[in-house]
Swiss-Prot record:
Per os infectivity factor that mediates the specific binding of occluded virions (ODV) to the host midgut target cells. The keyword Signal applies. It comes from the Viruses. Forms the PIF complex together with PIF2 and PIF3. The complex also interacts with per os infectivity factor PIF0. Pfam families: PIF (PF05092). Residues 1-15 form the signal peptide. It comes from Autographa californica nuclear polyhedrosis virus (AcMNPV). InterPro entries: PIR. It is found in: Virion membrane. This is Per os infectivity factor 1. GO terms for cellular component: membrane; virion membrane. Keywords: Membrane, Signal, Virion. The keyword Iron-sulfur does not apply.
Amino acid sequence: MHFAIILLFLLVIIAIVYTYVDLIDVHHEEVRYPITVFDNTRAPLIEPPSEIVIEGNAHECHKTLTPCFTHGDCDLCREGLANCQLFDEDTIVKMRGDDGQEHETLIRAGEAYCLALDRERARSCNPNTGVWLLAETETGFALLCNCLRPGLVTQLNMYEDCNVPVGCAPHGRIDNINSASIRCVCDDGYVSDYNADTETPYCRPRTVRDVMYDESFFPRAPCADGQVRLDHPALNDFYRRHFRLEDICVIDPCSVDPISGQRTSGRLFHQPTVNGVGINGCNCPADDGLLPVFNRHTADTGMVRQSDRTVANACLQPFNVHMLSLRHVDYKFFWGRSDHTEFADADMVFQANVNQLSHERYRAILYSLLESHPDVTEIVTVNMGVMKISVSYDTTLKNILLPSSVFRLFRFKESGTAQPVCFFPGVGRCITVNSDSCIRRHAGGQVWTAETFTNSWCVLSREGTHIKVWSRASRYPRGDAPAALRLRGFFLNNDRERNTIRAVTTGDMTQGQQIDALTQILETYPNYSV
């Protein structure tokens, strides 16, 4: 019963829904109304003008800067893109006038003007290196950063900031481009300076005036080894006048090899003389391979003060080995001058390999060896060369406590008359017995006997500590008169061969009539013979 009622109820609901849907589903037919087309075949055609002129504003804000407060104030401008531009910083406006010339106008910070700005513009401008610039273009103004000192700080292009440091080169760099005062940080050996004409800082080589009071550069006395006080009596007064302090320590000028620039054991000395002037020069220890020379180019302007006598003012150290290790060393000297016992009159001739040079610069004075040594027949090797250095201004007029130089060693051996500390004769014969012993002074009768019965000539003799030639130059056979004496080898040890004196005759040095001329010149030296 209940089931039948429920079924009947559902059928009624379905019937109601179906009836409602049928009622709302209405179809309308589209009604089309006819449209009447207008006939314009007889209407005349419009003929537009070939040129349309739109009148602009009469006021040109770019020719006459126009102050403003709002963008509306710029509607009067002929420039259509003009807006009210407020300036936060001082800016220079560059405009071309009616005369065709560029004119600059300064706009102060806080002022506003009607301007048409180009979209291509600089985004920033360092006030320490640049200034804002409005440059007139075809479309308006371009806001640019104009570099104040492009030689110091520049820009990558015209639309960039001035932030590329290029100054102070090549020996330094700019310290800080964001500083009001730009200065240089310079490399070692250079100092920052300022050119007032160009208003530009730069790096220049350091001079003495930059460090004269810097104790890290010029220490104060007591001075270390290899340095001397500025008031040293042997120093040139020129350097002393540039310092107010006399106890400043400077490099000993004799301790620097003038060719290689290397430091050596050479030392400056001053020896007082009777007349009170004194002798100034360099002492060059022979044991350290130093050779005393006189540099005439720095005689007046060098650090060594000139004295009343010409003395060695530099020490050379040409070899990186001891001179005894060299292939050949010859000491050639002349004995005829009146001051022979005080000053050397000598040259030294070396045969050395290029690998034995202490510095590359010494190659310039090492010449190719064209002949073998006069006393030794040997093959000349490829890398062997000859070097000649004058030691003529070495002196014994200095403190005996100083390390011995070449000439002092020579004088020590020259004064010896007993083996092994002496020089031996390598030419002539002055006595019949023990003629090869140390060079000594013999009586005239002994010399006559030796020359007569041995058919030889007496050559080497002495007068006190001074070795001389026995006879005048004109007495010897033509071409046999000694013009110089030489020691083969180096007399640092007592080897007989290294301490034997040989003669360089007039015939060895020249020929023909020049032999007679040279002989006459030798006759003019009072100390030539005993």
